């Protein structure tokens, strides 16, 4: 197993995947034509007078719209961010109508990408959008929107997408063979019902809701994602999430600027000014992002004790300032600006921070940051402070979509990051070794 130093000279190694990888991970539409078709159909439904009269705006969307109109600065920002945009949504009123359509449905499997991100992408890429989307009061309204959607996605009414139906030539239910194959792509040819706990003979495979399906459990972890090296080996650090490598950074600074072209972590911001922050200065961070079709639960990376769990309110649609105004390409050479912003996003987005004190003192205190991306805003821990965990134990889960995570090591930690994870586009399998003590 090749490893690299956990801390050498100041270094950031961006492993930003290609647009093709983001597309395969469910974060981009398959083509610009697919995006345009989605926007056109959504705009038609949202502007339909009969539809609007039948359903009306959901209460949190009414409150969101009222907040925009009650604050003169925010209102002007919501005017300015649409300037020059030719496609729908063309104004905040149409945006609210589109929300009203999206939040009444569960996502389907297909060629699109996260639906809210699809309608917000161009707005995020404006100065006015950045200014508005970093406002705390506005983000409280976004949280209300997503909490309301979450209630629906946790209800039995959301199961209508847990079917094998082909809805159109681009989209299908999550139990369609196309979707099932995508969800077990990295499981050595095993079938969905072999890998995950479900009953394929029951309606909806026995899942109680879309969220129940989304947070499916392994049928036998030791077959499909064994704890590599064994649970009793305390010299190893495992992957906490199933993901794709995005960034490795060394000599991470306590306080750093967040506007450089090269993405950078600022520990005080990332860790929400926690008193543990100084211990991680000049340490290292490994970050990955999750496939929309991936396993979305978290597993313990070490044998140790949960010291602290912190829920940090933050932003949902704030793109890195250095990328604002960059072209949104429709080619396979450059990712769109937002998807070049994941390190920045980890510093300011709504997230959960977990500190774990490893039993092995040569590893010591580590941190995990679980980051909700755009509409995927809910992170739920299933462990408590003071609880002891072993490598591979459940820690918690993301809700409702793809997300990102970061693992942080102290400068004095004697563990080193496994070299293969410093290569772009490397699949990180949960429970496999991502760092190990020096031999």
Swiss-Prot record:
Pathway: Secondary metabolite biosynthesis. Disulfide bonds: none annotated. GO terms for molecular function: L-tryptophan decarboxylase activity; phosphatidylserine decarboxylase activity. Signal peptide: none annotated. The pharmaceutical interesting psilocybin as a treatment option against depression and anxiety is being investigated in advanced clinical trials. It is an enzyme of class 4 (lyase). GO terms for biological process: phosphatidylethanolamine biosynthetic process; psilocybin biosynthetic process. Its EC number is 4.1.1.105. Pfam families: PS_Dcarbxylase, PSDC. GO terms for cellular component: mitochondrion. Keywords: Decarboxylase, Lyase. L-tryptophan decarboxylase; part of the gene cluster that mediates the biosynthesis of psilocybin, a psychotropic tryptamine-derived natural product. The first step in the pathway is the decarboxylation of L-tryptophan to tryptamine by the decarboxylase psiD. 4-hydroxy-L-tryptophan is accepted as substrate by psiD as well. The cytochrome P450 monooxygenase psiH then converts tryptamine to 4-hydroxytryptamine. The kinase psiK catalyzes the 4-O-phosphorylation step by converting 4-hydroxytryptamine into norbaeocystin. Belongs to the phosphatidylserine decarboxylase family. This is L-tryptophan decarboxylase. It comes from Psilocybe cubensis.
């Amino acid at each position: 197993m090749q490893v690299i130093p956990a801390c050498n000279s100041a270094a950031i190694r961006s492993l930003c995947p290609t647009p093709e990888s983001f597309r395969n991970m469910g974060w981009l539409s398959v083509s610009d034509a697919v995006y345009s078709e989605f926007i056109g159909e959504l705009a038609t439904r949202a502007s339909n007078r009969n539809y609007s009269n039948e359903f009306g705006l959901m209460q949190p969307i009414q409150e969101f719209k009222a907040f925009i109109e009650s604050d003169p600065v925010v209102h002007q920002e919501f005017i300015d961010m649409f300037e020059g945009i030719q496609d729908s949504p063309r104004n905040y009123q149409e945006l609210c109508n589109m929300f009203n359509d999206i939040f009444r449905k569960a996502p389907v499997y297909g060629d699109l990408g996260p639906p809210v991100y699809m309608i917000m992408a161009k707005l995020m890429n404006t100065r006015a959008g950045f200014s508005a989307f970093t406002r705390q009061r506005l983000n409280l309204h976004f949280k209300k929107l997503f909490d309301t959607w979450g209630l629906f996605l946790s209800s039995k009414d959301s199961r209508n997408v847990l079917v094998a139906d082909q809805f159109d030539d681009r989209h299908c239910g999550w139990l369609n063979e196309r979707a099932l194959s995508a969800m077990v792509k990295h499981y050595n040819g095993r079938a969905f019902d072999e890998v995950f706990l479900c009953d394929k003979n029951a309606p909806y495979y026995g899942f109680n809701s879309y969220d129940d399906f989304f947070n499916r459990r392994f049928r036998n972890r030791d077959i499909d994602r064994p704890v590599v090296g064994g649970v009793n080996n305390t010299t190893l650090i495992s992957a906490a999430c199933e993901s794709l490598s995005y960034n490795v950074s060394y000599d991470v600074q306590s306080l750093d600027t967040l506007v450089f072209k090269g993405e950078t972590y600022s520990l005080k911001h990332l860790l929400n000014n926690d008193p543990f922050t100084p211990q991680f200065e000049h340490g290292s961070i490994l970050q990955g992002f999750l496939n929309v079709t991936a396993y979305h639960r978290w597993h313990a990376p070490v044998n140790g004790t949960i010291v602290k769990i912190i829920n940090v309110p933050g932003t949902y649609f704030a793109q890195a300032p250095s990328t604002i105004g960059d072209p949104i390409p429709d080619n396979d050479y450059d990712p769109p600006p937002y998807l070049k912003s994941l390190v920045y996003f980890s510093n300011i987005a709504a997230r959960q921070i977990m500190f774990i004190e490893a039993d092995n003192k040569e590893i010591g205190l580590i941190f995990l940051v679980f980051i909700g991306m755009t509409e995927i805003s809910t992170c739920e821990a299933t462990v408590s402070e003071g609880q002891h965990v072993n490598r591979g134990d459940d820690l918690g889960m993301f809700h409702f979509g793809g997300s990102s995570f970061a693992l942080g090591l102290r400068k004095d930690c004697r563990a080193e990051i496994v070299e293969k994870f410093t290569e772009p586009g490397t699949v990180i399998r949960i429970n496999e070794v991502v760092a190990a003590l020096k031999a």
